[in-house]
């Protein structure tokens, strides 16, 4: 095996971050049920999804090198916050994040036909107190619609962040250090 991988994700952010690692990859998307199971903890949920995405890539026939699956979830009060379904959902989410610290969990998994290895990276992010106008203006920008928790730290949403403790890149969607370390461990066997 070489350091080349498959990236089982349509995310342009994950593509960009994996490129930064200098790892050769081919990108494709998988169709996976991303529903959270009843009573499933956010940590278990995000890790299960990353593993599911990687294993789904293997099931599609991508078997000559490791398949990388990843998922990110924003958590506040031990509740997972998904991508906003509409402006009302988004407004409710950002009001919960406003003036508070939340966790961003990003899971990374590598899979082949005979093994799966995964890890979860947790980062604490603190938001300033947001006005209704800031929340509405941010929604109108179009940026929050496809983001877990309704914001992108690497874009306009970054201006709401007063403090971060952990991996910035995990919040964006792929923790660089941990991804590289996990791949090295995976390839060593």
Swiss-Prot record:
Cofactor names from the entry are: a divalent metal cation
Pfam families, sorted: Maf
Instruction: Show the SUPFAM superfamilies listed in the entry.
Output: ITPase-like
Q: What is its EC number?
A: 3.6.1.9
Organism superkingdom = Bacteria
Catalyzed chemical reaction(s) = dTTP + H2O = dTMP + diphosphate + H(+); UTP + H2O = UMP + diphosphate + H(+)
Question: What does the entry list under GO cellular component?
Answer: cytoplasm
- Keywords in alphabetical order, please: Cytoplasm, Hydrolase, Nucleotide metabolism
**What are the catalytic residues?**
71 (proton acceptor)
Indicate the enzyme's highest-level EC class: hydrolase
A single BP term in Gene Ontology: nucleotide metabolic process
Q: Does the keyword Cytoplasm apply?
A: yes
Question: Where does the signal peptide begin and end?
Answer: none
- Main site of residence? cytoplasm
Q: Which family does it belong to?
A: Belongs to the Maf family. YhdE subfamily.
Task: Give a short account of what the protein does.
Answer: Nucleoside triphosphate pyrophosphatase that hydrolyzes dTTP and UTP. May have a dual role in cell division arrest and in preventing the incorporation of modified nucleotides into cellular nucleic acids.
Protein name as it appears in the record: dTTP/UTP pyrophosphatase
What is the originating organism of this protein? Answer: Pseudoalteromonas translucida (strain TAC 125)
């Amino acid at each position: 095996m070489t350091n080349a991988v498959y990236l089982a994700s349509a995310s342009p952010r994950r593509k960009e971050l994996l490129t930064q690692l200098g790892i050769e990859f081919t990108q494709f998307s998988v169709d996976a049920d991303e529903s959270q199971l009843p009573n499933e903890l956010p940590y278990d949920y995000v890790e299960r999804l990353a593993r599911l995405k990687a294993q789904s890539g293997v099931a599609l026939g991508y078997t000559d090198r490791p398949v990388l699956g990843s998922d990110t979830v924003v958590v506040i009060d031990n509740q997972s916050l998904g991508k906003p379904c509409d402006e009302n959902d988004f407004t409710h989410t950002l009001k919960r994040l406003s003036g508070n610290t939340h966790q961003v969990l990003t899971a990374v998994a590598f899979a082949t036909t005979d093994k799966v290895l995964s890890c979860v990276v947790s980062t604490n992010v603190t938001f300033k107190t947001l006005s209704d106008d800031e929340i509405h203006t941010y929604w109108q920008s179009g940026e929050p619609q496809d983001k877990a928790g309704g914001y992108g730290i690497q874009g306009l949403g970054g201006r709401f962040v007063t403090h971060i403790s952990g991996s910035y890149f995990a919040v964006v969607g792929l923790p660089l250090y941990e991804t590289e370390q996990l791949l090295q461990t995976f390839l060593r066997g």
